[in-house]
UniProtKB/Swiss-Prot annotation:
InterPro entries: Class_I_gatase-like, GATASE, GMP_synth_C, GMP_synth_GATase, GMP_synthase, GMPS_ATP_PPase_dom, NAD/GMP_synthase, Rossmann-like_a/b/a_fold. Pfam families: GATase, GMP_synt_C, NAD_synthase. ATP binds at residues 232-238. Keywords: ATP-binding, Glutamine amidotransferase, GMP biosynthesis, Ligase, Nucleotide-binding, Purine biosynthesis. This is GMP synthase [glutamine-hydrolyzing]. Pathway: Purine metabolism; GMP biosynthesis; GMP from XMP (L-Gln route): step 1/1. The keyword ATP-binding applies. Catalyzes the synthesis of GMP from XMP. Its EC number is 6.3.5.2. Residues 205-403 form the GMPS ATP-PPase domain. It comes from Prochlorococcus marinus (strain AS9601). It catalyses: XMP + L-glutamine + ATP + H2O = GMP + L-glutamate + AMP + diphosphate + 2 H(+).
């Protein structure tokens, strides 16, 4: 069945034009939290495409550029005459002002970063129920000097005269602060006001409606063909397995490829849970030695990811020929996966959008060019928290839904440098201790990820009056809402001490434990 014959996917009620902001996807998440579907699109989107999508509202994101720079990113200026409500955030507001005849100036002497009280100057639908002098998050070096005709100043801060503006006739609004970040006390109120009071959206983006819309789309796309799913036991592939099982039943075959990089006890748990408990067909493939052989001598993390991804598909192809034929490969690709694997940025010389790769994602970056399957990726527009809700609605238990995210390449990218069985055994034991103690302390559900990393160096230690020269283990525990940004977890010292003591006493070849306190950004959650 051709892709063009499929039923039309749901169009977003709110379009977010991305001008390079680190918060663009966060804006999308916040809008979805109001039960309204939103998507991030290029700032170069055409007027024709906007009219085809017919959104209820448009948001112009922030960005790192200055609007008066020669090649500053822009959008089609006709967008402001479509009659669609528009909210410009930070750079987005400045761009709107400039395009409509106002002026923006450098405000290096009064640049504003961090928390600032918002002083409301006049009533506005945008600031309805927002308390005067509430704290909002600022992050800008430029400011509006002169408003275009028809605009009013509706709020200011100590250093920003035009902290919020409006043109009620044309339904054009702007804020210099970032309502999408948690530091803005009434940020969600501002977003809800734009979504509901101004754009008149309907709260119809729910877990139930997603399932209702997705199941018939899967059936239409797949027809009577067979689907193969790589089942890892994580929340993404598990939710996808339940979703596909509900949609197409015995047309689905789940394949668990044990590449040797799983956490302690996971292969046994996975087979018992899906095959025996829920009677979803799972084929177990032991490919441990095959993967280890492929990684021999490989130290570069991108190479490891690519090799694992390609080998994964090769095994899939071989096993599908034996068990199949299968025409479709189902993947648990999520929205942040797509964003991270092919992010976007603006070329400062040409103003053109360019791809910026952060690191390849196992699902979307490691696929070989001669892939023999068609793809089924019904989760690719969802964030992680949305996937968990879908899983819960489909009947997945908490022990799966609340499991910490685990990368596709597994422990292979938590061992820095070359991977071998000795290092895997060492890391597997250390990682199990980390998670065991976190669970005993009742902190597991409060932490986004908690795991161990094995470094490719050795350190000197003393154990039993003898000198040791062994590997160090890094503890990595982070708090996050969606994995796009993260802060290191402030775990009580006594728990960290218990973890460290157990690792150095119970895990052979480890004599030192350190704790990573780097946030994302500037670091990433995984070390590779």
């Amino acid at each position: 069945m051709s892709q063009t014959s499929l039923k039309k996917e749901r169009d977003p009620s709110i379009l977010i034009l991305d001008f390079g902001s680190q918060y663009s996807e966060l804006i999308a998440r916040r809008i979805r939290e109001t039960n309204v579907f939103s998507l991030v699109v290029s700032n170069f989107i055409s007027i024709e495409d906007i009219n085809r999508i017919n959104p209820k509202g448009i948001i112009l994101s922030g960005g790192p550029n200055s609007v008066y720079e020669q090649n500053a990113p822009r959008c089609d200026e006709k967008i402001f005459n479509l009659g669609i409500p528009i909210l410009g955030i930070c750079y987005g507001m400045q761009l709107m002002v400039k395009e409509l005849g106002g002026t923006v100036i450098s405000a290096t002497k009064k640049a504003e970063y961090g928390r600032a009280p918002l002083n409301i100057d006049q009533e506005s639908d945008l600031l309805f129920d927002v308390e005067d002098k509430s704290i909002m998050w600022m992050s800008h070096g430029d400011s509006i000097n002169c408003l275009p005709d028809g605009f009013n100043k509706i709020a200011h801060t100590e250093n920003t005269l035009h902290a919020a503006i409006s043109n009620d006739v044309k339904k054009l609004f702007g804020v210099q602060f970032h309502p999408e970040v948690v530091h803005s006390e009434f940020g969600m109120r501002v977003i809800k006001n734009f979504v509901y009071k101004i754009s008149c959206c309907t709260a119809d983006w729910t877990t139930e409606t997603y399932i209702e819309e997705t199941i018939p789309r899967i059936r239409e796309q797949v027809g009577n063909k067979k689907v193969l799913l790589a089942l890892s036991g994580g929340v993404d592939s598990s939710t996808l397995a339940f979703l596909l099982n509900k949609a197409i039943g015995n047309q689905l075959t789940c394949m668990f490829i044990d590449q040797g990089f799983m956490r302690k006890g996971e292969p046994e748990f996975l087979m018992n849970f899906f095959d025996k408990k829920f009677h979803i067909k799972v084929e177990y493939i032991n490919a441990r030695e095959r993967f280890i052989a492929k990684l021999k001598g490989i130290t570069d993390p991108e190479q490891k990811r690519k090799i694992i991804g390609e080998e994964f598909i090769r095994v899939f192809e071989e096993e599908s020929n034996r068990l199949g034929p299968f025409q479709y490969l189902a993947q648990g690709t999520l929205y942040p996966d797509v964003i991270e694997s092919a992010g976007t940025n603006i070329d400062p010389k040409t103003g053109e959008r360019i791809a910026v790769k952060i690191k390849s994602h196992h699902n979307v970056g490691g696929l070989p060019k001669d892939l023999q399957f068609k793809l089924v990726e019904p989760l690719r527009k969802l964030f992680k928290d949305e996937v968990r809700k879908v899983g819960a609605a489909l009947g997945l238990p908490d022990e799966i839904i609340k499991r910490h995210p685990f990368p596709g390449p597994g422990l292979a990218i938590r061992i820095l440098g070359e991977v071998n069985n000795e290092k895997l055994d060492c890391l597997r034991d250390a990682d199990w201790i980390v998670r065991d103690e976190i669970k005993k302390a009742g902190l597991y559900n409060d932490i986004w990820q908690a795991f161990a990393v094995l470094l490719p160096v050795k350190t000197v230690g003393v154990m039993g009056d003898k000198r040791t020269y062994s590997w160090p283990i890094v503890l990595r525990c982070v708090s996050s809402e969606d994995g796009m940004t993260a802060d290191w977890s402030k775990i009580p010292f006594q728990i960290l001490e218990r973890i460290a003591n157990r690792i150095v006493n119970e895990v052979i070849s480890v004599n030192r434990v350190v704790y990573d306190i780097t946030s994302k950004p500037p670091g990433t959650i995984e070390w590779e």
